[in-house]
């Protein structure tokens, strides 16, 4: 248990949740309570086009690990949440106090009986349900309280253009080399277009 607590607080993955800092970081379960994807302490969740990484905090059950990479246990128990690049999540998370949390009925071939899953739309907003045998449903579609991941979109493009050809360090100087915003920075920006924001993204 001591090892788990120690590892949960090591910042292995930068988070990219709640880009507008408006509280878009919570799912809810009747038994789990509020599930926080951007907790104040420890590591949060990071969304990529192929997977989720990091940790989330549930007020009634504690830390939930989104990948075996958090504890270097993949050689023994290989688990995690995958993203098919279209926003359809699958796989399992793990909570020390309640066990496995399934993000898709495809995991258990139960979709014909109980059709559920968690999705991420084009704006980065989560929706749907995850399921745990020990605590039941976790709802990602709660009105006014939902999880949203940062995505590179027209807001970022407008901010990038506003810095075009500026000198000196600024959020659009993505190559961190010449201290100006030029075509090299644009090439980096275009590579992230419509994808999830990388670590340290400052163009929101």
Which role does the model predict for each range below?
Residues 12-151:
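Peripheral, non-catalytic segments of secretory and membrane proteins
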Residues 11-15, 197-200:
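Bacterial Sec-dependent N-terminal signal peptides
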């Amino acid at each position: 248990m001591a090892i788990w607590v120690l590892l949960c607080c090591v910042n292995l993955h930068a988070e990219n949740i709640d880009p507008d800092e408006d509280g878009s970081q919570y799912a809810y379960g009747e038994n789990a309570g509020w599930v926080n994807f951007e907790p104040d302490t420890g590591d949060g969740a990071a969304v990529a086009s192929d997977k989720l990484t990091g940790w989330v905090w549930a007020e009634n059950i504690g830390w939930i690990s989104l990948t075996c990479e958090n504890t270097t246990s993949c050689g023994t128990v290989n688990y995690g949440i995958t993203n098919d690049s279209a926003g359809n999540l699958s796989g399992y998370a793990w909570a020390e106090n309640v066990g496995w949390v399934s993000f898709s009925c495809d995991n258990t071939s139960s979709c014909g009986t109980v059709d559920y899953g968690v999705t991420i739309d084009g704006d980065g907003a989560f929706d749907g349900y995850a399921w745990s045998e020990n605590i039941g449903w976790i709802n990602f579609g709660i009105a006014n309280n939902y999880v949203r991941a940062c995505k590179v979109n027209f807001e970022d493009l407008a901010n990038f253009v506003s810095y075009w050809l500026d000198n000196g360090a600024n959020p659009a100087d993505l190559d961190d080399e010449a201290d100006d915003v030029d075509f090299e920075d644009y090439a980096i920006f275009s590579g992230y277009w419509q994808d999830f924001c990388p670590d340290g993204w400052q163009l929101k």
